[in-house]
Structures are given as structure tokens and as C-alpha cells.
Design a protein with these regions (language model features):
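Bacterial signal peptide processing site
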Residues: 28-31
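Bacterial N-terminal signal peptides that target proteins for export
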Residues: 2-16
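C-terminal motif of bacterial Sec signal peptides marking the signal peptidase cleavage site
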Residues: 22-26
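Pocket-lining segment of extracytoplasmic ligand-binding domains
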Residues: 187-190, 194, 199-289
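Secondary-structure end/capping motifs
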Residues: 256-336
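Short, glycine-/small- and polar/acidic-enriched structural segments
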Residues: 34-194, 211-214
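Conserved C-terminal helix/tail region of periplasmic/extracytoplasmic solute-binding proteins
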Residues: 327-369
Length: 369
């Protein structure tokens, strides 16, 4: 039997590290992104694996920049040929995992916590992490009038996106490292941890109902635009200042039956990341344009610019940090120790990277045997 805390985690941790800035979902899974993919299909192209379409999911967050840019610039469609790239946008991890399990999407960009939770709940049968996408982009932003140093966080009200999500677990772990005590489930203790949806966190900050927030981008930069101060960048707590914020997952069934299609999507991802690195300003504009297309609202420059700078695009899933994030959840009492063996299958990604003369990546011993 799962413990009460584990049940709470299954509702919370799957909400994902990259929770929504924008309200995108219009149905139970997400909303179809507006696109003109048919117009981008090259004449004479052939279908991959005989598929009419490949269904790709992602969040309307800058931490999903690879998917945003690849959609906007047509990289997915280019690699899929006459197989149509179809898109769904999501605003929470559980709905994307549900969509993957039901076949509503085949491949998705998602945070580490829902990937861990989806994998463990299915006893390792529903998904594989097949690549990385982004690192960083998480900050502790506070009201500088109330909090002037890290020790001042004690006794204050600090928001995280959701019980058991990646930022929530990271903040609880940081609190414990300070020697302070907080009940993980209630959020009560030496610090009041206030679980607040990212959509309303800026308003909660403006109203004074919270004193700060441990949140991903671009929510962090929205708080700064409202007068907040970055007190801590989570990247400073990790070796080499790198930790996974977004991974690429695939249905195990789809991976087994359509490896060529999966390889095509991974090739598009690698090519997109290369283009982003070479053209950061154009890529930033492309990501924002896709956000606007998906949601009807682009980010203002005072939010977009600092948020973009704090996110590192990467092909590496940073597997060792996923294991550490799971250990933090166990330490907080929000997760029973998971068996993550087999959560990664980086075979196709490393094939693509080798063909592109790029460095291959490691699964930290958590790959398919």
C-alpha cells in the first residue's frame, strides 16, 4: 500500500518542474497548437514508418524552448517528411502523462518530477526518457523589503508551484539544509510553504499574501518585473550549475513500434538546439512567437530577456541530477524510494549525436539493460 504522503505526491509531483505561465489547456489533456505544418511538408516527401502523424506535446514555458522553436521554425516537420507533426500544449504534468498513456500524444517535453512519477506509478512500463532539453531557470525571488538575506527566509511565506513538484521538493531540501523544520505535506513550520499555481503567483506577490517564491522561468522574471529580487539561483546549488528542468519522453509502445519516427524527432531536437545556440536572439523571438501562437499572448521584453538568459539548452538529460531530485523527494518524505532502472533509453539520441559529430550522453546507470 502506498503511504498517504506517496498518494499526495502522485497528485503533486507529476505537476512538473515546468508549470505553466500561461493558461493553455482547453480540454482534458491540453490544447492543439495552431500551426501550418501541412504547408511545411516538402513535396515528394515520404511518410516515416508509414505514420500519418506524430503527436508531440509540450508546455507553454520557456523551459520547453526546444519544442517551441522546433515547432515555430518547422524542424519537426522537416525531419518527419510527409508524416504530419501534430501538437498539443499542456499546463500540468499529470495531463501530459495521461495523454501519453492514452496515446493522445506519442512524444513529449516534460519536467523530471512527472517523468519519475509516471514511470514509477506504471512500474516502469509506460515511458522512457530519450533525451534532454533544458537545464536551470529556477530562482528564489523575494520581496526585498521583507527579506534581505537568506537567513531572513525563516518565518516567511514562500510559494512553490505545487505540493511535490520539482521546485517544491528543491525548496524543502534547501530548507532542511538550513537546519529548519517544515512539515512537507502541510507546508507549516519554520517557513510557510504556500503551494500556489504559477499563473496566480505574481498576483499573490503583489497582494502581499506571499513574501517570495521558489519558481521556474518565466514566472521568476515576472516577479522581478513586479519589484522582486533574486535571492538565490538554484543552479548555484548543483555541480557545474547544471540540473535537469526539461526532458524528452516517449511512450514505450511508440518507441518499440516506430523507432525511425522517434529518431526523426530527436534529430529535429538536436538540430534545433544547435540553431538556438548559434542564433540566441532569433531563437528567443521564435520561442516567444510560438508562445503567442499557442496562447494568444507573448511575453514582454522585461520578462522574456532575463528568463531566456537563465535557461541552458542541452541535449544531455543530466541523468545523475534526476536521481538526486528523486532522492530529495524521498528525504522530504514525499516519495517512497523509487526504482528508476530503465527509465532512460538514450540509444537513438546517441546515434543522432554521433552522426552529427556531437558528444554522446550518459544515463547514469539508469538505462535499459
Amino acid at each position: 500500500m502506498r503511504s498517504t504522503r506517496s498518494k499526495l505526491l502522485s497528485r503533486g509531483i507529476a505537476a512538473a518542474v515546468t508549470l505553466p505561465l500561461l493558461a493553455l489547456a482547453a480540454c482534458s489533456y491540453g490544447s492543439e497548437a495552431k500551426d501550418d505544418t501541412k504547408a511545411k511538408v516538402a513535396a515528394g516527401s515520404e511518410k516515416i514508418d508509414g505514420l500519418d502523424s506524430v503527436k508531440i506535446g509540450y508546455f507553454g514555458n520557456l523551459t520547453h524552448a526546444t519544442a517551441l522553436v522546433a515547432n515555430q521554425k518547422g524542424y519537426f516537420q522537416k525531419e518527419l517528411g510527409a508524416t504530419e507533426a501534430k501538437y498539443q500544449t499542456f499546463n500540468a504534468g499529470p495531463s501530459e502523462i495521461e495523454a501519453l498513456n492514452s496515446g493522445s500524444i506519442d512524444i513529449g517535453w516534460i519536467g523530471p518530477s512527472p517523468a519519475i512519477n509516471g514511470f514509477t506509478k506504471s512500474k516502469g512500463t509506460n515511458l522512457r526518457i530519450i533525451g534532454g532539453s533544458a537545464s536551470g531557470g529556477v530562482k528564489l525571488v523575494v520581496n526585498p523589503k521583507k527579506i534581505k538575506s537568506l537567513k531572513d527566509v525563516k518565518g516567511k511565506k514562500i510559494a512553490t508551484p505545487q505540493l511535490g513538484n520539482t521546485q517544491d521538493v528543491a525548496f524543502l531540501n534547501w530548507i532542511a539544509d538550513q537546519g529548519w523544520n517544515v512539515d512537507a505535506n502541510s507546508g507549516k513550520g519554520d517557513v510557510s510553504v504556500v503551494r500556489t499555481d504559477n499563473k496566480i503567483t505574481p498576483d499573490a506577490y503583489k497582494s502581499g499574501s506571499i513574501d517570495g517564491a521558489w519558481v521556474p522561468e518565466p514566472t521568476a522574471s515576472k516577479l522581478v518585473a513586479e519589484g522582486g529580487k533574486v535571492l538565490l539561483d538554484e543552479s548555484t546549488l548543483w555541480p557545474d550549475k547544471k540540473f535537469v528542468i526539461t526532458n524528452i519522453i516517449v511512450s514505450q509502445k511508440f518507441l518499440k513500434e516506430h523507432p525511425k519516427a522517434v529518431e526523426a524527432v530527436l534529430k529535429a531536437s538536436v538540430e534545433t538546439n544547435k540553431w538556438i545556440s548559434a542564433n540566441p536572439d532569433e531563437a528567443k523571438a521564435a520561442a516567444n512567437k510560438q508562445l503567442e501562437a499557442d496562447s494568444g499572448k507573448a511575453l514582454p521584453a522585461d520578462v522574456l530577456d532575463p528568463a531566456w538568459k537563465s535557461i541552458q539548452i542541452t541535449n544531455d538529460p543530466l541523468a545523475s541530477t534526476l536521481n538526486t531530485e528523486a532522492a530529495h523527494a524521498v528525504k522530504a518524505g514525499l516519495l517512497e524510494k523509487p526504482d528508476l532502472s530503465g527509465i532512460y533509453d538514450l540509444t537513438l539520441l546517441n546515434k543522432v549525436l554521433k552522426a552529427d559529430d556531437e558528444s554522446t550522453v550518459d544515463d547514469a546507470g539508469l538505462g535499459v539493460k
